[in-house]
């Protein structure tokens, strides 16, 4: 075991050196993703140059330093609109000011080109389309360089899992504070919800939905059982047909798409 760990550590060090020198209802667990064996080819020289520039410019994020860094980033980068390009069409997203850490984290990862490209790793019809936690070589290297960290939960009574909600995945095991993953996001496809279901959830969660929120869940649908379990930090504003088309892509038994569903994200000027 020690030999294998040593080899893994050595391989990771060599990779970094190369980069530096050459440039129930279902739950959402960020630890569920696994590789489908289709790793993207890495262009070493261009990636190395960008990675080297990134290393020199920014610290590796940790649970200890991410909050201060992201709040500073948010103050310097006020944009809240994003374009999500997929095989089914383009979507427009917006993030919320009152969820500052998650919104800044998303902006930062987009600006660092982490999602250019990435892939959707979990698709469940009438539930969610989840992406970002790719196990491609490029994604793993960038997560190591940018920093492996989590985010404190930012729950708000007005930020719920309606259809089109943008939220972060998280690990369920050993995570009583419900801290979010920092790369793994999802979009709610959802299904129609009855008032009886909402009443049951109110009893279970000790939360009362407003009449407007109940009406919206009944009218539009969503995944209300995830309310106050995952942080909602944005929403889809255009491209619902593309989201629906993605949500019915064939998958294997673990909800991984049978065909690679690549996407790209970019920041739009407000």
Each language-model region and where it sits:
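Bacterial N-terminal signal peptides that target proteins for export
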Residues: 1-10
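Bacterial N-terminal signal peptides
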Residues: 9-18
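Cyclophilin-like peptidyl-prolyl cis-trans isomerases
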Residues: 21-270
């Amino acid at each position: 075991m020690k030999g294998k760990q040593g080899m893994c550590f050595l391989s990771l060090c060599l990779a970094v050196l190369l980069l530096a020198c050459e440039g129930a209802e279902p739950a959402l667990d960020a630890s569920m993703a696994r590789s489908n064996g289709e790793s993207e080819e890495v262009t070493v020289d261009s990636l190395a140059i960008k990675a080297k520039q990134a290393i020199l410019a920014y610290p590796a994020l940790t649970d200890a330093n991410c909050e201060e860094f992201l709040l500073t980033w948010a103050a310097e980068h006020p944009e809240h609109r994003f374009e999500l390009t997929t095989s089914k069409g383009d979507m427009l997203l917006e993030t919320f000011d009152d969820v500052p850490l998650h919104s800044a984290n998303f902006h930062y990862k987009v600006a660092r080109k982490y999602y250019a490209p990435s892939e959707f790793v979990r698709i469940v019809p009438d539930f969610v389309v989840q992406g970002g936690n790719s196990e491609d070589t490029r994604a793993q290297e960038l997560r190591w360089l940018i920093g492996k960290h989590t985010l404190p939960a930012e729950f708000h009574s007005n930020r719920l899992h309606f259809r089109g909600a943008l939220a972060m995945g998280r690990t369920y095991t050993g995570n009583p504070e419900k801290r979010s993953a920092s790369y793994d996001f999802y979009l709610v496809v959802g299904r129609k919800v009855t008032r009886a279901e909402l009443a049951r959830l109110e009893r279970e969660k000790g939360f009362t939905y407003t009449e407007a929120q109940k009406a919206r869940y009944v009218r539009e649908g969503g995944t209300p059982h995830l309310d106050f379990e995952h942080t909602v930090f944005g929403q889809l504003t255009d491209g619902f047909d593309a989201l629906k088309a993605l949500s019915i892509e064939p998958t294997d038994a673990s909800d991984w798409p049978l065909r690679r569903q690549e996407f790209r994200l970019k920041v739009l000027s407000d």
